[in-house]
């Protein structure tokens, strides 16, 4: 099942906000903070990619 447009847009918005947070964290915070923010970005990206892959598999 693919993500709804509303959820997909919310995730894209979240990624944008997290990228901004990562940029600030890289300059001012301890490295583990940046690491966790980057991990959140990766998880959102992975969720969106896997959702697309599952949809293609289910179509066949």
Language-model segments: what does each one mean?
Residues 1-28, 32, 44, 49-58:
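N-terminal acidic leader/helix
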Residues 31-39:
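Short, charged, amphipathic alpha-helical segments
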